[in-house]
Each structure stands twice: as structure tokens, then as C-alpha cells.
A protein has these predicted regions:
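Cytoplasmic helix-loop-helix junction between adjacent transmembrane helices
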Residues: 88-125
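Small-residue (Gly/Pro/Ala) motifs that create kinks and tight helix-helix packing interfaces
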Residues: 9, 41, 131-140
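C-terminal ends and interior cores of transmembrane alpha-helices
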Residues: 60-79
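Helix-loop boundary and gating motifs at the non-cytosolic
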Residues: 1-35, 193-201, 205-225, 230-237
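Helix-to-loop junctions at the C-terminal end of transmembrane segments
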Residues: 36-50, 140, 247-261
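Symmetry-related core transmembrane helices of the 12-TM Major Facilitator Superfamily/SLC fold
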Residues: 146-164
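Juxtamembrane intracellular "pre-TM" segments in multi-pass secondary transporters
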Residues: 165-200, 222-226
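Residue-level signature of mid-helix packing/kink "hotspots" within the transmembrane helices
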Residues: 31-39, 129-130, 134, 242-250
Length: 263
């Protein structure tokens, strides 16, 4: 999804001409909707184990990204912003913002079931994101529609990979997952440590996300005389940043296993 998400803010503001207020509204509604889908995905996937109906849903959304972005989302944002806002939040929440967490959770279940290191496997996802971000800036400077069609193409590849994965032990994994009850949710909200963690996330990750996804891409691309050059160079910069992230993801599990998580 780095083929379009890494330059999402630049596309919205530079190509579609949205205001800063509209941009912030889009991001906030997208994130709020994704939270609802995350809770749904978490409960359902815990019961499914390694069964893949939700992964199939995500596959179809990836394939439909190109047509949706070009023929539905882009025209609606320019002609009927509110409708485009709602449809986009539902689409991105199902397939990307919450879908990314779903895929991480699914991979973690596979790691425990097949006894491989999740962090090292997850690093390959970051390497893939870095490659996508590198070319995203180049293609965006030509036409953003190229990026959207490429997402659909790779979504079809993802679907074919999904078809090839047939695990005979998924029933066992699903059986090990206990049912989530209403009391479990209430207990979490009564836990003081949970609210301390929420405040920590709001004060760190949330503000960093605003800077990283909304402010910095537009600011950096605007430093150059040509908007296309700025978009291309931002893709290079973002790619290098994610490569470093992937390297740390690959080596940190070995360090954590040696010194312990708390240390």
C-alpha cells in the first residue's frame, strides 16, 4: 500500500487541491473508522485462527483499489466531499488502516503456529513498503493513476498467494482461541494501566502520525520549485527511512531474546 499511501497527503493537497482543514478531517475520520474495524477484526480473527475469510475480504479490496480511487473516490472528493469522505473511510478502514493490523495479527498467529520469528518476518513487509515508496514518488510525478492501478495489480498477486496458502492446522489454532466476552472489554476499561497507555499513545504515536503522514510530506514536497520533483524526492527519502526501520525490525528480535523484553 506504500504505492499510494506514502504520497496520499501530497495527492490530496497538490493534485486535488484540498485545504488543510479538509485534509485533517479526512485523516481523522479515516482513523476513527479504522478503530471500529480493528475491534471487529480482532474479535473475529481470534475465533477464526488461521482461517482466511477476512484475509479474502482484504484481498478483494486491494484488487478494487484502482477503480475505486480513480472512478469513485477522486471525483467525489471534488464534487461531494462528505460522501467521498464516508466511502473512503469505509474502504480504507476495511482494506488498509485496519487491514494492516489484521495482516500483522494473522502473521503473528502463523509465527506462533509454525515457530518462526515474527519480527524478522515483519521486516520483509517494511522492505516491501520501502521498495513501493521508492517508485511511488516517480510514478506520482507522472500520474497518480499509475500508482492506483499498480496497487490493484499487486492486490491480484496477493490474492494468488492467498489461494496457495492452505494450512491443515487452522482448526487447531482456532480452537485454542478463547471467546471474547463483554466482561473482558469492561475489565480493560477499568484498568488504570490501560488509560496510562492510552495517554502515552496519544502523546507520542498519534502526534508523530500527524507529522509523518499529513504535515511532512506536503512540507517537504513544497521545498522544491517543481512539485513533481518534490514528490519524487520525498519517495526516495521515505524509502530510505523505511529501509532503516526494516533493518531494526530484523535484528531487534535477537537482541530482545538475549536481554529480555523488560530490560
Amino acid at each position: 500500500w506504500s504505492l499510494w499511501w506514502s504520497s496520499y497527503a501530497i495527492w490530496l493537497k497538490g493534485h486535488l487541491g484540498l485545504t488543510g482543514t479538509e485534509l485533517g478531517t479526512l485523516y481523522s475520520v479515516n482513523q476513527f473508522t479504522s478503530i471500529l474495524f480493528m475491534m471487529f477484526y480482532g474479535i473475529v480473527q481470534d475465533k477464526l485462527g488461521l482461517k482466511k475469510p477476512l484475509i479474502w475480504c482484504m484481498s478483494f479490496i486491494l484488487v478494487l483499489t484502482g477503480p475505486f480511487m480513480i472512478y469513485v473516490y477522486e471525483p467525489l472528493l471534488q464534487s461531494n466531499f462528505s460522501v467521498g469522505l464516508i466511502l473512503g473511510a469505509l474502504f480504507f478502514g476495511l482494506g488498509y488502516l485496519a487491514g494492516c493490523g489484521l495482516l500483522d495479527s494473522f502473521t503473528e498467529k502463523m509465527a506462533r503456529n509454525f515457530h518462526f520469528e515474527y519480527g524478522t518476518a515483519r521486516a520483509w513487509g517494511s522492505f516491501g513498503y520501502a521498495i513501493g515508496a521508492f517508485f511511488a514518488g516517480i510514478f506520482f510525478s507522472i500520474s497518480p493513476h499509475i500508482n492506483f492501478w499498480l496497487v490493484s495489480l499487486f492486490g491480484a498477486v496477493f490474492m494468488m498467494i492467498n489461494m496457495r496458502f492452505k494450512d491443515k492446522d487452522h482448526q487447531c489454532v482456532a480452537a485454542d482461541a478463547g471467546g471474547v466476552k463483554k466482561e473482558d472489554f469492561i475489565a480493560v476499561f477499568k484498568d488504570r494501566n490501560f488509560w496510562v497507555f492510552v495517554i502515552f499513545i496519544v502523546g507520542t504515536w498519534s502526534f508523530y502520525n500527524i507529522f509523518d503522514q499529513q504535515l511532512f510530506p506536503v512540507f517537504y514536497a513544497g521545498l522544491f520549485e517543481s512539485h513533481d520533483v518534490g514528490t519524487r524526492l520525498y519517495g526516495y527519502l521515505n524509502s530510505f527511512h523505511v529501509v532503516l526501520e526494516a533493518l531494526y525490525m530484523a535484528i531487534i528480535p535477537f537482541f530482545v531474546n538475549r536481554v529480555g523484553p523488560k530490560n
